Amino acid sequence: MTTLQERVAAHFAESIRAKQEAGKVLVEPTVQAAELMLQCLMNDGKILACGNGGSAADAQHFAAEMTGRFEKERMELAAVALTTDTSALTAIGNDYGFNHVFSKQVRALGRAGDILVGISTSGNSANVIEAIKAAHERDMHVIALTGRDGGKIAAILKDTDVLLNVPHPRTARIQENHILLIHAICDCIDSVLLEGM
């Protein structure tokens, strides 16, 4: 029987290993995602973000880093989390079903050249999948943060989209990597805007 201290230590060790494994495959696609976002934002586009549960919190976290700041002062950047308007979410969910709570907002707010960030640890969240389909209808780019094998989301992405798939089976480790990816993207964007990298 393990002690609570051993369990906590095991979480740290597994989290470190998961990040190291993800880092082996996700550095280049993360840079691609940041460059795609920069291109969108510099052309007066916007970024929409969505997810469920912890992924909804990540979508909101990302939007806050864009509209406010990450670590350094810079201009405000156009990003909206589609997870925050309870009136829209409940009205759409009630009238059209939960699978459409994000896609209806994407169709209302998204324009060609904008970006949808879809976050799903399983890669199989039906409402995120519908949002991606809606984004493609609007000629938007998609940046998908997924886990495990990428799920159904990986299969519907276009060549012009970016897949950031964390190859780990545990939801907690995937979520920890997703927030790391979000922070890395924010840092890349700030580095280009503030330092001309």
UniProtKB/Swiss-Prot annotation:
Keyword annotations for this protein, in alphabetical order, are: Carbohydrate metabolism, Cytoplasm, Isomerase, Metal-binding, Zinc
Its biological purpose is as follows: Catalyzes the isomerization of sedoheptulose 7-phosphate in D-glycero-D-manno-heptose 7-phosphate.
Does the record carry Cell wall biogenesis/degradation as a key word?
Answer: no
**What is one GO biological process annotated to this record?**
D-glycero-D-manno-heptose 7-phosphate biosynthetic process
Q: Which reaction does it catalyse?
A: 2 D-sedoheptulose 7-phosphate = D-glycero-alpha-D-manno-heptose 7-phosphate + D-glycero-beta-D-manno-heptose 7-phosphate
Q: What else does UniProt say about it?
A: The reaction produces a racemic mixture of D-glycero-alpha-D-manno-heptose 7-phosphate and D-glycero-beta-D-manno-heptose 7-phosphate.
Which family is this protein grouped under? Belongs to the SIS family. GmhA subfamily.
Q: Which cofactors does the annotated protein need, by name?
A: Zn(2+)
Source organism of the structure: Neisseria meningitidis serogroup C / serotype 2a (strain ATCC 700532 / DSM 15464 / FAM18)
- Tell where it localizes: Cytoplasm
Q: What is the protein named? A: Phosphoheptose isomerase
**Per the database record, which ranges form the SIS domain?**
37-197
Record's NCBIfam families? gmhA, PRK13936.1
Q: What EC number(s) are associated with this protein in UniProt?
A: 5.3.1.28
Pathway listed for it is:
Carbohydrate biosynthesis; D-glycero-D-manno-heptose 7-phosphate biosynthesis; D-glycero-alpha-D-manno-heptose 7-phosphate and D-glycero-beta-D-manno-heptose 7-phosphate from sedoheptulose 7-phosphate: step 1/1
Which of the seven top EC classes does this enzyme belong to? isomerase
Q: Which residues form a coiled coil?
A: none
A single cellular component GO annotation: cytoplasm
